[in-house]
Amino acid sequence: MSSRKRAAIIAAILIGALLLSILINSIITLVQKSNHPIKYSEYVEKYASEYNVPEYMLYAVINVESSFDESLRSEDGSIGLMQMSGDTVKLLSSDIHFDKDINIDSLYDPETAISYGAYYLRYLFNKYKKWDTAIAAYYAGEGTVDSWLNDTEYSEDGESLSKIPDKKTRSYVKAVKSAADYYKNTFYRNGVSVK
């Protein structure tokens, strides 16, 4: 085989490998984007701004909690996009921002769910000062997280969790962090939306 023919074959193989690599990368990107949609952006942007919660964090919590299914009701009675419980809604409705007589079924409305969820995330972040701890409290409850923070086995400083003892909460925090990282790195540059 001549060196010219060999060079042509090598070039064809390299071009084929490059095209295959581009195709695989495109498929991976499409799958990741389909697993991390951007929905209800009008409400996410509005309440992220109003309550000073990063948009990507709201998208991540909605994605992990409900996969953007506004009609979801879990076995424990949590409702809507942000899967909030009746007890949490009662707690939040005592705040001046919200209707004191809210019906729990109002959380099937995306705007209501995102409004309450964003407010609650800000409340938890203000209390715990770290997103990991706030996200753990969103899932497991404040009382549970407070008890972990008071236990030196789980918190070295009483302010942040060095270990999350509950496997489901640990998995939840990991899933939200992973989704938040994806949203942040894919749809935001220097805090500015590029979606």
Task: Place the predicted regions along the sequence by residue.
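Cell-wall polysaccharide-cleaving catalytic domain and substrate-binding groove, primarily
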Residues: N63-T88, G141
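Catalytic and substrate-binding regions of cell-wall glycan-acting enzymes that process beta-1,4-linked
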Residues: K127, A136-G191
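Substrate-binding/active-site groove segments that recognize
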Residues: Y47, D76-D99, S115-G117, W148, ...
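Export/targeting segments at the very N-terminus of extracytoplasmic proteins
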Residues: L20-S71, S93, T186, V194
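Second-shell loop/turn segments in exported
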Residues: L30-S34, E45-Y47, E70-I79, D99-P110, ...
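Short, functionally critical alpha-helical segments immediately adjacent to catalytic or ligand/cofactor-binding
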Residues: N52-E70, I114-A118, A134-A140, V176
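N-terminal Sec-pathway targeting helices
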Residues: M1-L23
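Surface-exposed patches in mature extracellular/periplasmic domains of secreted proteins
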Residues: M57-Y59, L72, D101, Y128-A137, ...
